[in-house]
C-alpha cells in the first residue's frame, strides 16, 4: 500500500526489528516502568505471528497496533481472544471516496470487513484517522462518528497531517480554519457520542504539551534508530548498539527534555509544526542525523514547509487558547 503523503514512506520497506530486538526493547522498557507498546508501520500485521508471540511473552503489557485492517482474519481474531492484551487501531480516512483516494482502491471495504469481524467476536478496537485539508469535514461529521460507533469502535485517534519527508504533500496541511473546525467538532461530540476520542495535536493541554523525546513516549524505527517522535526522523543513537536508558540520555532527547514545553499555548505543542525553528535548533544543537534512508530530508528543508503553517496557525491558536482559559 502506498498512501499519499505517508510519514513512514521514506524509511524503506525492507527493514525490520527481529523478535529478539522487540523482546529486548520491552524488557528494558518494563525496567523503566513502561507497560504499553504501540506498533506502527508499514503494516505491522504482516508479522501477525510475531505480534501474538510478543503478547504471549509479555502478558503484563498492553499492545496496540495501527493497521490498515486488510490482514485481520478469523484466525487472528481467535489469537486476540486468547492473548487478551492486543488491540488494533484501524486506519480510516473518512468515507469510501476520501479514504480510497489516499489509501488505495478497495481499502475502505477491507476496513469494513475487518470491523465486522472484530465486532462479531466482541473484540475491542479503535480507529486511527489522519485529518487533512481534503477530508477534515468528513472525519469531523456526525455521520463519520456514527459510522465508527455502529461498527463497534471504542475509540478514535485523530492525527493532524504532518509534512514529513521529501515526498510530503504540503497542500494536505489543514488551514487554521479547518483545524479549528476539527477542534470544535471533536469537543462537541465528546459530550454527545459514546466513543473515546484523542486528538494528537489539539489535546496537548491534557498532557502538558509535547510528550515526545522520552517525556512520555519515544519511537524506534525499523532499523533501530531511537527517535523522539514517530514524526521526527532524526536520531543520535540506535537500539542495536545502545540501551534504552542511554538513548534517553542522548543529545537529542536531552535537548527535548531541556526545552519542553515548547510553548505555553497548549494548542502549539510541537517543535516541528507549530513552533517555527525549534526542531531545527534541537537537531543542529544535538548533531542528530536524518533517519529517512531512501530520501534523507535536511532539517532546513523540513523547516521551509512548517514556517508558513506555524505563522498562520498562531493567531487562531492564541484565540482558541484564550477562550479556553476564560
Regions found by a protein language model. Name each.
Residues 1-19:
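Canonical Radical SAM [4Fe-4S] cluster-binding loop centered on the CxxxCxxC motif
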Residues 1-4, 35-39, 220, 224:
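N-terminal pre-triad scaffold of radical SAM enzymes
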Residues 3-6, 210, 224, 229, ...:
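Short cysteine clusters
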Residues 9-12, 216, 235, 276:
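Secreted/processed peptides and extracellular or luminal domains of membrane proteins
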Residues 22-39, 47-159:
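Radical SAM/AdoMet-radical enzyme domain recognition
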Residues 61, 100-213, 222-223, 227, ...:
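Radical SAM enzyme [4Fe-4S]-AdoMet core and its adjacent flexible, acidic
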Residues 231-326:
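Flexible mid-to-C-terminal extensions adjoining Fe-S/redox cofactors in radical SAM and related proteins
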Amino acid at each position: 500500500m502506498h498512501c499519499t503523503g505517508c510519514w513512514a514512506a521514506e524509511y524503506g520497506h525492507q527493514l525490520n526489528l527481529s523478535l529478539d530486538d522487540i523482546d529486548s526493547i520491552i524488557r528494558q522498557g518494563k525496567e523503566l516502568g513502561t507497560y504499553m507498546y504501540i506498533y506502527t508501520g508499514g503494516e505491522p500485521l504482516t508479522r501477525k505471528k510475531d505480534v501474538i508471540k510478543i503478547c504471549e511473552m509479555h502478558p503484563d503489557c498492553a499492545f496496540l497496533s495501527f493497521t490498515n485492517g486488510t490482514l485481520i482474519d478469523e484466525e487472528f481474531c481467535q489469537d486476540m481472544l486468547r492473548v487478551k492484551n492486543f488491540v488494533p487501531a484501524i486506519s480510516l480516512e473518512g468515507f469510501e471516496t476520501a479514504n480510497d483516494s489516499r489509501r488505495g482502491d478497495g481499502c475502505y471495504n477491507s476496513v469494513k470487513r475487518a470491523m465486522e469481524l472484530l465486532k462479531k467476536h466482541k473484540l475491542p478496537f479503535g480507529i486511527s484517522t489522519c485529518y487533512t485539508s481534503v477530508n477534515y469535514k468528513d472525519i469531523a461529521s456526525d455521520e463519520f462518528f456514527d459510522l465508527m460507533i455502529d461498527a463497534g469502535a471504542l475509540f478514535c485517534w485523530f492525527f493532524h497531517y504532518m509534512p514529513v519527508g521529501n515526498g510530503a504533500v504540503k497542500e494536505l496541511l489543514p488551514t487554521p480554519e479547518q483545524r479549528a473546525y476539527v477542534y470544535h467538532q471533536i469537543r462537541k461530540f465528546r459530550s454527545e457520542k459514546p466513543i473515546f476520542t484523542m486528538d494528537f495535536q489539539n489535546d496537548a493541554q491534557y498532557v502538558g504539551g509535547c510528550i515526545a523525546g522520552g517525556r512520555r513516549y519515544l519511537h524506534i524505527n525499523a532499523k533501530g534508530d531511537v527517535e523522539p517522535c514517530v514524526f521526527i526522523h532524526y536520531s543520535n543513537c540506535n537500539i542495536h548498539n545502545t540501551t534504552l536508558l542511554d538513548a534517553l540520555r542522548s543529545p537529542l532527547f536531552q535537548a527535548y527534555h531541556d526545552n519542553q514545553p515548547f510553548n505555553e499555548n497548549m494548542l502549539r505543542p510541537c517543535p516541528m509544526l507549530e513552533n517555527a525553528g525549534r526542531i531545527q535548533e534541537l537537531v543542529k544543537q544535538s548533531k542528530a542525523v536524518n533517519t529517512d534512508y531512501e530520501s534523507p530530508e535536511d532539517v532546513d528543508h523540513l523547516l521551509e514547509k512548517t514556517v508558513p503553517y506555524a505563522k498562520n496557525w498562531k493567531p487562531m491558536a492564541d484565540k482558541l487558547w484564550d477562550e479556553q482559559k476564560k
